[in-house]
A protein has these predicted regions:
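Terminal RNA-binding accessory module
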Residues: 52, 464-587
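Conserved SAM/AdoMet-binding glycine-rich loop
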Residues: 127-128, 136, 299-436
Length: 587
């Protein structure tokens, strides 16, 4: 067993009373240890602490994909740490957990490439593959050399226990606590569940591959060990992994803006989306748990928190409890969640991640507009502005509904950054339908866009639709929207030149030669006005504004500080700003 490189993970120090056995809570019985007996000591005295070379198993979690996957990865790290394992670099770890994404074909490719690369770089590691790709196509992953076990999202909440079990009991079977035939039946029931949701007699959604033994076809006498599979019906899954994810550099003093997943799964059935079939029904983190997590982060000194989920606006719909407020008992829902965080914690700034348009209710918009503790930022997925395309996508809103929401948000919060997800190249998308989307976006006050090219996902209705758009056409449309997004972002940023904005420091210092690719005269002049020294003005601290814009601040500043700043210029898509004098900031 290898220990974490450059750390004390491979040693254990114990303090013993007379005639007691060595005691180490961080080690599990699955990992035998040999501790020499200690010489008897004088009666009534304590023995000094002694250190023994005890091999402590190590782990590394690598995440692929969205914020929800990152949050799952943070929860997995908690699992392994609670089992007494120590973190290590990927090429040194005993267990490497690949937490995968499957939202696009390229995401699957990235995961397979990572597995092959890891087997070359760390051939002795136990490779455990989990996440959405593992849930969707476990046997496909199990066929790759070097994979020890494939653990779907259905079993992710027990992953650390599974890892310890695999350490001593590798084998060629599905290890789910029931026989293989039952595993097949549960996997089949996923398609039945999806068909029931869609009101059809055929499985339109989620026809995941049925688990079958992986016939590696080894040469006689050279049979390779089979990867163990831990997969079951995701729609029966009720667990929700939750742990904050930190942005910024991975040091104790520079991590900022933790991200907390408070909801998982989705009950929508968009025709292009694989997510419900690999994450299951919508489920919420109970409010008391949310409040505990937020208060713990506040106590640790964090100033901003991002709350996220697969379908965040649906938070609370699955919870039976009501919330007691000054207006009486009310059913848990998204606006109640926001109100409770504001009322029951001292969090300085709450940022809301992506929320579907139908969940931007008048109540939510008013709360964001009227609370200085909620960031001026709204991300509202669009996908398409063509009514015909939205209907083929099975989206629940029409273009005029969406327009109304964006206009309301902008009217209530004029300085807010408004972003959207847009998909191009959806099956059957005509030039006219794309132009409708292009014109629609041009007319609305968007700050930024996340533009995606459609990627067919196995088992989704869209994958079987006729008139698939040629790749070169979809890529051209993608570029057109990205160019439009760049124009809108620049116009939005220009509107703040000479004004003030609040921003949180991220603690990442840049030399000007790295931060900017063109003339530095404006930033240097701004720094000189602040009295910075020659050495200091070559450094910039990265920050993020309340309305979600990157910002560079001359000099070095501690991470995790909210500052009121004067916006001086724009460089490489980021603001360059100077701090206000104390008296100005207080006004």
């Amino acid at each position: 067993m290898r220990s974490a490189a450059g750390s004390s993970a491979g040693r254990s120090c114990v303090v013993e009373a007379p005639h007691t056995r060595p005691h180490n809570h961080e080690l599990k019985k699955e990992f035998p240890r040999h501790i020499p007996e200690l010489a008897p000591s004088e009666a009534g005295s304590r023995k000094p602490a002694k250190c023994y070379d005890i091999p402590v198993p190590t782990f590394h979690v690598e995440n692929f994909g969205c914020r929800a996957t990152q949050a799952d990865g943070a929860a997995l790290e908690r699992q392994f740490a609670s089992q007494g394992l120590a973190r290590a670099e990927k090429n040194d770890a005993d267990f490497v957990i690949l937490n995968t994404c499957t939202v696009t074909h390229s995401a699957d490719q990235d995961a397979r490439a990572a597995i092959r690369r890891l087997q070359r770089q760390n051939p002795h590691a136990k490779i455990l593959v989990t996440g959405c790709y593992a849930q969707r196509a476990p046997e496909e992953i199990a066929a790759l050399p070097g994979v020890t076990a494939v653990i779907g999202n259905s079993h992710k909440h027990n992953l650390a226990e599974i890892a310890l079990r695999e350490q001593n009991a590798p084998g060629d079977m599905v290890r789910e606590g029931h026989d293989f035939s039952r595993a097949i039946e549960e996997q089949k029931s996923i398609a039945a569940s999806a068909a029931e949701v869609n009101g059809s007699g055929s499985p339109q959604f989620v026809p995941l591959s049925i688990l079958t033994p992986n016939p590696r076809n080894p040469e006689p006498g050279h049979r390779k060990p089979q990867a163990a599979l831990y997969i079951s019906n995701i729609f029966a899954h009720t667990e929700l992994l939750a742990a904050p994810v930190f942005e910024g550099e991975a040091t104790e003093n520079s991590r900022t803006r933790p991200n907390l997943k408070v909801q998982d799964g989705c009950d929508n059935r968009c025709s292009f989306c694989i997510i419900p079939s690999v994450r299951g029904h919508s489920r919420s983190l109970p409010l008391p748990h949310v409040i505990r997590e937020v208060n713990a982060l506040v106590a640790a000194g964090y100033k901003e928190l991002v709350i996220s989920g697969i379908n965040l606006g649906r938070w609370g719909r699955d919870l039976s409890e009501t919330q007691n407020t000054h207006a009486g008992s009310r059913k848990a829902n998204f606006v109640r969640l926001l109100e409770s965080i504001l009322e029951r914690t001292q969090l300085e700034k709450l940022r809301i991640s992506s929320v579907e348009p139908m969940d931007w209710t008048d109540e939510v918009i008013a709360l964001v507009a009227n609370s200085p503790r909620i960031a001026r930022h709204a991300h509202v997925p669009l996908q398409s502005a063509s009514d015909a395309v939205l209907r083929r996508m099975h989206r629940k809103y029409r273009p005029w509904h969406y327009r109304e929401k964006i206009e309301k948000i902008h009217a209530a919060i004029p300085t807010a950054a408004i972003g959207a997800d847009v998909m191009v190249g959806f099956p059957g998308e005509t030039d006219a339908e794309f132009e409708t989307t292009h014109r629609f976006i041009a007319e609305l006050p968007f700050t930024y866009l996340h533009v995606f090219t459609y990627s067919a996902r196995p088992g989704t209705p869209a994958a079987a639709m006729p008139n698939q758009v040629p790749v070169h056409v979809a890529r051209e449309r993608n570029k057109i929207l990205r160019d439009l997004a760049a124009e809108k972002k620049h116009a939005f940023m220009q509107s703040f030149i000479g004004k003030t904005l609040d921003a949180i420091t991220l603690g990442v210092a840049h030399d000007t030669s790295v931060a900017f690719s063109d003339n530095h005269s404006e930033p240097l002049a701004a720094a000189s006005q602040c009295g910075e020294s020659e050495r200091e003005i070559s450094l910039y601290t990265e920050a993020l504004t309340d309305n979600y814009q990157k910002l560079y601040l001359p000099g070095t500043h501690p991470a995790n500080r909210w500052l009121t700043l004067h916006i001086a210029s724009i460089r490489d898509g980021a603001f360059v700003a100077t701090p206000l004098a104390t008296s100005e900031a207080k006004q």
